[in-house]
Amino acid sequence: MHPQKNAPQIDAMFLYKHRKNVHKKDATTNQISFDFNNWYTHALAQSPTFTQTMQLTGEQMAILQSQGNIKINAVAGSGKTTTLIEYARSRPPSARILYLAFNKVVKQEAAKKFAQHGLHNVQVETAHSLAFKHVVPGRGYKISPHGYKTNEIADILQLSSGGEKHAEFILASHINKFVSLFCNSTAQKVQTLDYLSTIADSKAKSFVQKHHEQLLYYTRLFLSRMDKAEIDIVHDFYLKKFQLSAPVLPYDYILFDEGQDASPAMLEVFLKQHACKVIVGDTHQQIYGWRHAVNSLEQVDFKSYLLSSSFRFGPDIARLACEVLDLKSHYATHTKVLIEGKGTSEKLQTKAVLARTNLGLLLKAIEYVTESKKIKHIYFEGNINSYTYADDGASLYDVLHLHQGRKLQIRDKLIKGMKDMKELEDYISKTEDMQLGMMVEIVKEYGGRIPHILKSIKDKHVGDEERDKAQMIFTTVHRCKGMEYDAIQLANDFISQEKLEKLNDPKNRNKPHPGKLNEEINLLYVAVTRAKKSIHLPEEFLPEGFPDSPHIHVMRNAIAEKDATDASRNHQQSHEKEKAYDVEQVRSKHSDAYKPWTPELDDELTVLYCEGVHVKDLMKHFGRTRGGILARIKKLELPELYD
């Protein structure tokens, strides 16, 4: 549990004063170890209220008492940062401690927290910031901050098509991925890696087999040119250089956070150090396998500890999270996870829509900006432009111009080289470029309405400094990892039990790898565990037989992914009102259209309205017309009371 704000600080000075009692020196090894029991006894003597105000759980206490290398499997919201702070504070005050954070944002937050607790002996880094300091200065390297576009690699390496349509761009795309695979691996040489095994699509696999020698040659050439500083280096390149240099780091303790998504290259550096090692993470939050990350918690034989209580959410959301993970039993042996939900939050300030993909998120954002007049300010986690641009640099507008035959207006060289959408889709299948694939789907869905829709989204979007003004936050699961919101809504692009059963059907010849299914379920688990107070989710994501809960709102009759697309194509004007001249026709479409509103239904409508649920979803949920929903909202004076 998190310490209370007024908790007494058992700081480095206190430990120094009592060093004879709390630290032991081994006469044989000369190593200093920490005696938790003596520290705790002296802390209690120093402050009689220590045990009451610190409120550490038994699991946290066990971690503080530990000696040697350990790994901590910590469920979502279990106070792992608090635990690591207390762990660091309980070590010798002269100990040199390195905390490895997952990304820059987490690094900045962690640095503040350690400093606030007087732990100035803790250095906070990310894997990349640490590697940068050891590799880049003084070597003449320049960084390519956003990596390389496919057409840039084709130009740098002077690739040719060889008579095969767009082969130079397809090859460049695979070179980019091969470089990423090598830089994140522990391999000493590129040629020892099996790149082909990472490819799933049959067309892409066929291309790689046919051009394997070229792919290997040009990948090595591209890496060599970066190494010689002939071209700018990518971030993963200096991480790889760091690993290959076999560094010896000057720390007594190294704390490795988010260990379930570790770069193999950085993990090797970590494991080779002589320091006392701590890995913390959540096995079921592994969602970066596509970026070659591995679950280090499963790769080391350190003594294992648990943090199984979540202080973010209560028992109902905890149960839902556990039952989501039970989906893994459909394709593998699964040990049931138990999470104790101890959260008691009743606030309703931050509301967020979470999706698995950029496409799913944009579709929900489009619904909000075109249908909901009350939404004035929205916020996208991360740069809003990143949702309309592929990593390669191609924009949604480029794909739209290709779709409309306006090639002169296309800026991206790769898209400009495509004859038509069919050629682009063929390229996508040979490269497994999922982001471009999503853009194609959006363009097919909304066509010429896209410029107006994107303008509406950007007009309502607030910057980072005004994030608190946002009435709704939009984010993918990957972008909100480590974050939390009072109320969340899930888009319908996650995996469901029904989808899982179809994919895992013995008759399915293209059954996905269990590791990919694992990450799909993990994505749903991570999404569910971002909520502090309440969740709104399509009914297909609710486990069968799950009990009613005031914190879990099921959006009945939610449209499935394909149905949503079909419905949207038929829906020419987003503000078009339903023409319901025939009562029976309306009743057949909206089963409860003319049933009276009860106090219970009014209460439910009020809750859903306050938590930002979209009118379209309210229509499906209550089985009523748009006009019926809006009339009841007006009757209850909800805009006046809650907007």
Show which residues each predicted segment covers.
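P-loop NTPase Walker
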Residues: 27-140, 322, 529
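ATP-hydrolysis module of ASCE/P-loop NTPase motor domains
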Residues: 140-222, 407-428
